[in-house]
Amino acid sequence: MLSSIADGKSTIRNLNDGADLQSTINALKACGAKIDSRNQTITIEGVDLTNPNEKLDCGNSGTTTRLISGLLSSQKLDFTLVGDSSLSSRPMKRIIIPLQEMGCEISSNDNLLPLTIDAKEGIQSIDLSLIHI
């Protein structure tokens, strides 16, 4: 994920090409990332990510959902995250609250997916205690 916003080109070898990785790749590509994936090797060219024209389908990947929400928010993007029925039943409060405190506007289905996150105004640092989430 970080390679998608880093300067230059990154190559990662010996990746397990599972469904979670594919969900991440598809979401990043929808935001303009330049990613080539073949034979357990992925090449990512860092770019300025852009607002996607579609909802970002995280499949069943909670990791994709949680990490990409922070990454894209840091890029001042406006996006919607969706997932399969299993992921859509998992509470997202532990990412909603910190992102809201950082300045994102978020709408959700009672703290469940889909999440629409508007971070166009940017995010600020916060002091957060994870015990309360």
Question: Which ranges hold each PLM region?
Answer:
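Structural preference for solvent-exposed beta-strand-turn elements
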Residues: M1-I131
